[in-house]
Amino acid sequence: MVEHATGSFSLTVLGSDGSYPGPGGACSGYLVRAGTHCTWLEAGPGTLANLQLYVPLEQLDAAVVSHSHADHRSDLESLYVALRYFVGRERFPVYVPEGVLEELRGEHFGSTFDWRVVSEGQSALLGPARWTWRRTDHPVETLAARAEMSGRALGYSADTGPAWELAELGEGLTLALVEASLARAAEGTVQHLSARQAGAAAARAGAQRLVLTHIAPGLDRESAREEAEAAFGAPVELAAVGRTWEI
C-alpha cells in the first residue's frame, strides 16, 4: 500500500482498455486520492483487483460510476460480495446516474451500498474534493466529472462522442483524462472519440495536461498519442495500469 500526504491530489490508473479488456488488461478504473480520501472512479472489469494493490477495501471511501455499460460498472458486483461477506461494511457510498440503478435492478445489494444518484450539473463533496457531473454525448445517460481540490482540477470525459465539449467541465483543468476509443478512420461511426478528437477537445478546454484513456485493444497506442499531440499542441500521455499523476 502507498502512503498519501494530507494535501496530495492524485490519479492512479487501475484499468484503461476501451470497451473490453485486452490480454492481461482491465477496463476503465481509476483511484482518485484527495488527501487521505480514496475514491474508486469507474468499476470496469479487472479494476477491483488492481485497486487493492493501493488501498484496502476497509479504507476505500466511495465509488463513482459514469454510466451503465458493463465495461464501466461490472466490478461493483464483486465489490458488493467483498464488502457484504468478507469485509463487513454497510452503507458504502456509490455515486451513479439513474441508469446504473435501472441496469442493476434485479440485483439484491441490501444495505451494503448507499446509492447516491447524481445527474447533470449536480455537485457533491467527496472528502476534501468537490465533484461536479455533466452529461455527455453517449447512447445512455453518461456523466463526465470534474474533481477539484485546493485550486487543482481533474477533468474526466467518461464515454462521449464529439457533440459534447470537455470545456463544459469548466476552466482551469490541471489534468484532463479523455477517452480515445476510435481510430481516426472510424470517427463519426459511434458516440466515442478518436485520439485526434480528444486532443482537440482538451485544447479547446484549455487543459494543462492530457492523458488518453479507453483506447481499444488492438489500436496503435503510439499513433494515437501522436495524433492527440498534434491536435492538443503539447505532449500527451497514455493511461496504463499503475501509472500515477499528481494533479
What does each of the following model-derived ranges do?
Residues 20, 70-73, 103, 122, ...:
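Active-site environment of divalent metal-dependent phosphoester hydrolases
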Residues 1-12, 32-42, 149-152, 156:
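Metallo-beta-lactamase
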Residues 163-246:
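Cap/insert and terminal regions of metallo-dependent hydrolase folds
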Residues 40-44, 61-71, 154-158, 176-179, ...:
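Active-site neighborhood of phospho(di)ester-bond hydrolases with catalytic His/Asp-centered motifs
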Residues 90-99, 209-212:
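Short internal beta-strands
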Residues 28-32, 143-147, 245:
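Short beta-strand scaffold segments in enzyme catalytic cores
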Residues 116-172:
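Catalytic core of the metallo-beta-lactamase
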Residues 19-68, 74-84, 165-169, 198:
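Pre-active-site segment of Zn-dependent metallo-hydrolases
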